[in-house]
Amino acid sequence: MKRILLAEDDNDMRRFLVKALEKAGYHVTHFDNGASAYERLQEEPFSLLLTDIVMPEMDGIELARRATEIDPDLKIMFITGFAAVALNPDSDAPRDAKVLSKPFHLRDLVNEIEKMLIAA
């Protein structure tokens, strides 16, 4: 079973994503901030980091940057209302990260995750 680490500070969105991703067959470990997610990344491997960009304690771009230092093969997907930030070539976001802009259809999220993990 593929393991997803989810970092999303919006409680309702996080609960919704966890439920949907588990229903799609993924094991999901979730946190409401980047710092806690980063701590878990240091303890165990994941197939995908699914993260919001704007979060307290550590933003999603910094989390993704640090995560790929630990595991260069980790797939990264940003879910955000601030797509321009992630796509900015001057940002520290990993170059092969995917960005899904809020609002999005759950079907689109699951399809993008499946594509990323198949390519792994």
UniProtKB/Swiss-Prot annotation:
InterPro entries: Bact_response_regulator, CheY-like_superfamily, Sig_transdc_resp-reg_receiver. Transmembrane segments: none annotated. Changing residue 16 to R: 90% reduction in phosphoryl transfer from CckA-P to CpdR via ChpT. This is Response regulator receiver protein CpdR. NCBIfam families: RespRegCpdRBruc (NF046022). Its main location: cytoplasm. Residues 3-117 form the Response regulatory domain. Component of a regulatory phosphorelay system that controls B.abortus cell growth, division, and intracellular survival inside mammalian host cells. This signaling pathway is composed of CckA, ChpT, CtrA and CpdR. CpdR is a response regulator substrate of ChpT. Unphosphorylated CpdR controls steady-state levels of CtrA in the B.abortus cell, likely via CtrA destabilization and activation of its proteolysis. Disruption phenotype: Deletion of cpdR does not result in a gross defect in cell morphology and has no effect on intracellular B.abortus replication and/or survival in human macrophages. Signal peptide: none annotated. Keywords: Cytoplasm, Phosphoprotein. Is phosphorylated by ChpT-P on Asp-52. SUPFAM superfamilies: CheY-like. It is found in: Cytoplasm. It comes from Brucella abortus (strain 2308). Coiled coil: none annotated. The gene is cpdR. The modification 4-aspartylphosphate is found at residue 52. Gene3D superfamilies: 3.40.50.2300. One of its GO terms (cellular component) is cytoplasm. One of its GO terms (biological process) is regulation of protein stability.
